Every structure is written in C-alpha cells, then in structure tokens.
Curated annotation (Swiss-Prot):
The chain crosses the membrane at residues 242-262, 337-357, 373-393, 420-440. The gene is pxcA. Keywords: Cell inner membrane, Cell membrane, Hydrogen ion transport, Ion transport, Membrane, Transmembrane, Transmembrane helix, Transport. It is found in: Cell inner membrane. InterPro entries: CemA. This is Proton extrusion protein PxcA. Pfam families: CemA (PF03040). Residues 114-136 have a biased composition (Basic and acidic residues).
Length: 460
C-alpha cells in the first residue's frame, strides 16, 4: 500500500507540468470563445458595440483568464525543471486522475456557460500536442501584450530628412508601414483605456451621441440591449451575493465557533471551584453589588413582617445559595471575553480569506456601489453625508462613542477604563471630522461639485 501511494505521488509530481499547461490552455480557449462569440474574432474590447458595463465585465473576465495563464505557465516552467517532459509532438494531456482540466471545463467563461464548449468542439477528435498548446496560448495572449519599445537611434537624422513636427501630435509618425500597422493594432487593443488619455478632433459627447444613434439603428440593437441587460443583471447578482457573503459568513462563523468550538474548549479548563479573587475587578463589583441588594431585600421583607432584623438559618441559607449562584454566573462571564476574542479572530480570518479569493467580485462590487451612489440625486448625497458626519462627529456623537466603547470593552472582557474612553472621544472624532472635510474638498468637489454645493446649502 505504501509503494502504491508513493507511486501515485511520483506520477502526480511528474504530471504537474502537463496539468499546468492544460490549465493555461483551457484559459486561452475561454478567451478565444469570448472573442469569437462577442467580438467577431477580434480582441476583447476592440469594438464599440457593447455598453460600458458590459465592456468592463469582459475586461474583468479577460484579466482573470490572463492571470490564470500567467500563473499556470509559471508553474509549468518551474515544475519542468524537476520533471521530464514528453516529446513536444506527442499528446499533451495530463493523467486521468488529474481533475484540474475537468474543473476548468466546468468553470464559466463569460456571460454564457456554453462559451467554452463551442471552442472545444473543434479539438475533440484529437488532443493537441505540447507545442500546439503553447503556440495557441502565445497566439491568444500576444494581442493583449504591449509591444516592446522601438530602440531609438543615437545618431541624429540628416537635416535633409528632418520634417517639421505636427502640432496635433507629440510623437513623429513612423514611416515604416509595418510599424504603422502595429501601432494601429495597439491602439485598437487598448480601446478600454481611460477616455481622458485620448485626444479627439471633435468633442467626445458628439462622438458618443453618434455612436449611440448608430447602435440604436443597428439591426442587432435589440439583441445587444438584451445581452447588456443580462450582463448587468449578472453583475448585480454577483455584487449583492458577495456583499451578503461578506456580512453573513463571518458573523455565522463567529457565533458557531464561540458556542460550539471555543466555548466548550474554554469551559473545559475552567476551575471547578472558582473563587471571587479569580474575577476581574469590574465583575467583583457587580457580584458584590448584586449580593448586597439581595441581602437588603431579605432584611426589608423581614422588617415588613415585623420579624427580628437578625437573620435566621433560612435566610442565611438563601444568602449562601445566592453567593454561589453569583460566583458561578460571573465566573462564566469572566471567560466570555476570551471566547469572544478567539471567535472574532477566526471570523476576521474568514473575512480576509473572502477578500483574498474574491478580487474579481470586489471589482464588480465596487462598480455596483459606484453606479448606486452616483445614481443618487445631489440632495440624497448631501443628506447621506450630513447623516454620517452628525452621527460620528456631530454634537451628540460623544454619547454614542461612549456606549460603543463600553460595549466593546464588555465584549472583549476588558475593564471599562473611563480615562481611555474620554481621551478617545476627545481625539478620534476630531480626526474623523478632518478626514471628512478633506475628502469633500479633495475628492467630492472634483467628482460632483453640485452635491458639494447642495451639502453646504443644507448644512448652513
């Protein structure tokens, strides 16, 4: 059995280059499927028939697949040092027990789940070799790589060949037709660059209006509109689902880990006979205060019934049981802070793990929030800003900060330090107020000046 495990482990290590190459090849197939289906065989983002949100969605898919190709090829090169590759002309498939390729086939490649299957139907009869896969990957990724900078000649050109530089361009136009073609192709592939970085002879609003009219008069306008709506709906579902996942999953992990993992583990090490000295100073005060209240309550009831103020055996027995009950109660509360700290750390790790693996979803979520916020009116934006500033740095905010810090200290099992709380309230809201004003002056004043004007009018 041990030899079988070692044999399979050796096969898995030796097949690592082929599996890595398969993952890169499948990612290239998915890029090719998107190009053929949505861009007529051209590069992704090379035409203007799609809306802004749809184009951004395709760019996210493209970056994801290109990153998968880069990581897989890096693994292919690194593992090839330790494993012997087969003949480059032979079949380039991985072993049967490798599931990476199957997982790549099942992964969605774009707005439609069947995009990758259309690109794979042509290769079902014969699995390509290693060289064919590498050539196909280079062919797909070449159009998304920036061309290398042309070396400049150190010798100045002859005076007879010098031409006056046009006023509308900051670089001389190359005379070689091949260089012109490469530059045109580069500009076509980089059409998703920011609009502010390009120059145009006409105002961009006129060009956008003409492009919008052309799209509306196109025979495929309804299909494009439906496809854009489906893409927008998919992005909204992804953003809302990821936002709920970020909010709910760490909370569930914190609750279940506290009650079912760390709770029994911490209670197991709790002393069987706790003492009052093991409690924190705050819990000692609460236990003694509650005990004194219970004792005075018994004395008050005895006085109402005209009984002797001295406690009898029954009353002393009640006080003894109450003392044991309070000791057990506050001993458990004394360990609640440790349970909460352990559960909070685990929930933060889960939250960080979600952020780490959901980079594409974060970009979709940012786009969704930008669209949601910028879709608000100026009055709504100003109302939200005033609400947040008044809650966190307004006149009544010190009371809220005091309650928040006291609750946080109780949650972590820490003693409530009034000096720290008052010092925090005296400094941190001031920093937040400065940060809000800087953000309004630096960012919001440039993005939405009308919202800033409405904010000042409402605030005054």
């Amino acid at each position: 059995m041990g030899e079988s495990v070692l044999s399979r482990l050796g096969q898995w290590i030796s097949s690592t280059p082929l599996r890595s190459l398969d993952r890169a090849y499948e990612a290239a197939l998915r890029i090719k499927a998107i190009e053929d289906r949505y861009f007529q065989g051209g590069s992704i983002g090379s035409n203007g028939n799609h809306g802004q949100n749809t184009s951004r969605y395709f760019q996210i898919q493209l970056r994801q697949e290109l990153r998968q190709i880069d990581l897989s090829l890096a693994e292919f090169r690194a593992s090839s040092v330790f494993s012997r590759l087969p003949d480059p002309e032979q079949n380039g498939s991985g072993p049967p027990f490798s599931s990476d390729k199957d997982q790549a086939k099942e992964a969605p490649v774009g707005p439609s789940e069947n995009d990758g299957k259309d690109a794979e139907n042509g290769r079902q009869s014969r699995d390509p070799s290693i060289l064919e896969k590498l050539e196909f990957i280079d062919q797909v990724t070449s159009r998304y790589k920036r061309p290398a900078a042309q070396p400049r000649s150190t010798s100045p050109p002859p005076k007879s060949q010098e031409q006056p530089e046009p006023l509308t361009s900051s670089q001389p136009e190359p005379s070689d037709p091949s260089i012109k073609t490469n530059l045109a192709k580069t500009n076509l592939d980089n059409s998703n660059a920011p609009v502010a970085s390009k120059t145009a002879l006409l105002p961009r609003s006129i060009l956008r209006t003409a492009n919008q009219i052309r799209r509306e008069l196109s025979s495929q306008a309804e299909e494009e509109l439906l496809q854009e709506y489906r893409s927008q709906r998919t992005r909204t579902l992804v953003a809302v689902r990821f936002l709920l996942l970020l909010a709910i999953l760490p909370l569930l992990v914190q609750i279940f880990s506290k009650h079912f993992l760390f709770g029994p583990l911490v209670d197991r090490f709790q002393p069987r006979e706790p003492t009052i000295l093991a409690l924190s100073y705050e819990f000692q005060e609460k236990a003694l205060s509650e005990f004194e209240f219970f004792k005075e309550k018994i004395e008050f009831e005895r006085a109402l019934h005209h009984q002797s103020p001295e406690l009898d055996l029954e009353s002393e027995d009640q006080l003894s049981k109450k003392a044991e009950e309070l000791l057990q109660k506050y001993s458990r509360k004394n360990l609640e802070g440790l349970k909460n700290v352990l559960a909070d750390v685990l929930s933060l790790l889960v939250f960080g793990w979600l952020i780490l693996i959901g980079r594409e979803e974060i970009e979709v979520l940012k786009s969704f929030l930008d669209r949601l916020i910028y879709g608000l009116s100026d009055s709504a934006k100003a109302f939200i800003i005033i609400l947040f500033t008044d809650v966190f740095v307004g006149y009544h905010s010190p009371h809220g900060w005091e309650v928040l810090l006291s609750s946080l200290a109780a949650h972590l099992g820490l003693p409530e330090n009034r000096n720290f709380i008052y010092g925090f309230i005296a400094t941190f809201p001031v920093f937040l107020d400065t940060l809000f004003k800087y953000w309004i002056f630096r960012y919001l004043n440039r993005v939405s000046p009308s919202a800033v004007a409405t904010y000042h009018a409402m605030n005054d």
